[in-house]
Amino acid sequence: MFVVSSRASGASSQPHLVRCGQVAHDMVWKLAYTAFVVVVVAIWLRHYGWRNLLWFSDIALIGAVPALWLESATLASVLAVAVLLPELLWNVDFGLRLLLRRRVTGLTDYMFERERPRLLRVVSALFHVPLPILLLWMLAEYGYDGAVGLPGAVLLAAVVLPWSRAVSSPERNINWTYGLGARRTRLPAQRYVLQLFAGFVLLVFIPTHLLLNALFAA
């Protein structure tokens, strides 16, 4: 009877050990990502200033920290709708530029500017390349909240785009609020930002929402 009880006790403890191992693994992963974000933000603040953190990609980088710790489908969904498509395009443009050795769309031109410190370009690649993978992983783990993802991204853009225009400059062109790429708009600021907002909603947010809702809806 003693042997049987010991075996039963050992068998029952195995799931507990597995859960503890998973919790420890998740904790290490969350701490590592949080530390990485702290380092990136510190570098950005030193070299670019706080305004650079208004880029949608930087908002997603930082926003993923509470999304991970809270295991929040809501936060992950809003961030994914807002930046997943642009981040995928960034990676495609960057990869093709490396492979073809020629300018493709211009989206990642700054990554090949020799006058830009290599450290800044390396750090940029280290967060832009894995960011869409992280967003997709969170959606797979936590699910996609379709009721919040799209309206949350729309609200985020409604706040961030006018703010970016107000504190940016044609040279910084944060979130393209002064023109797409190197092209500068001649439209009045309010009208252009409104059109840019509509473009994000219609061409980025809605298609992304529909795709994610089909793939990851909880």
What are these regions (language model features)?
Residues 42-50:
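Short, hydrophobic transmembrane alpha-helix segments
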